[in-house]
Amino acid sequence: MNKDINKGIIKVSPKALINSKWTKVEVSNQEKHFIITIVKFDEYQKVTECVIEAVMTKNTYAIDWRELKKINTWKMGWQ
């Protein structure tokens, strides 16, 4: 996973998503740090399901994994 600041996106590999850590740029509901807990693939190795869990509240959310590429919404790692 590499950052490509010039394009405003982060390069994210679907195969590296599980257990990866993310920081939400705009905190809501006291949820800032997240971890990817579920990633499912179809027979063509395309992501069919991605679930992210808030570290503090343990709330889980289904997410389109492509949203993690947007640097104005997500940062890779816990910051």
Model-predicted segments: where are they?
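Mixed-charge, Lys/Arg-rich low-complexity intrinsically disordered regions
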Residues: M1-I18
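Generic beta-structure capping elements
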Residues: V39, E53-V55
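Intrinsically disordered, low-complexity, charged/polar segments
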Residues: M56-Q79
